[in-house]
């Protein structure tokens, strides 16, 4: 494992355990659980270095003096979606397709490039 990846994992674990403080905490989230198909209200999300370190009912252990806390007022959050079967043909640039997919919450694409 590269040292930067190891450092990132250690940082995420430290925040999740409350040993290190997060950069950002989102409060009052309605979390869409893709496992149980339910909406989990009042979820809190702690973020460090643009990565999610903690998701749960109470992220106060991750909040420090420099942590920015944003109340998102019961808006919905969900994990990034993966599109596991698609084809891009010669009429669509892959970079443009990726941009449009992100707007729909798709963060992972598994595709077959056809005639590009």
Show where each model-derived region lies.
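Generic beta-strand/beta-sheet core signal
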Residues: 55, 111-112
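Conserved small/polar residues in nucleotide/adenosyl-binding loops
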Residues: 114-116
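Histidine-rich, glycine-flanked metal-binding segment
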Residues: 4-24, 31-78
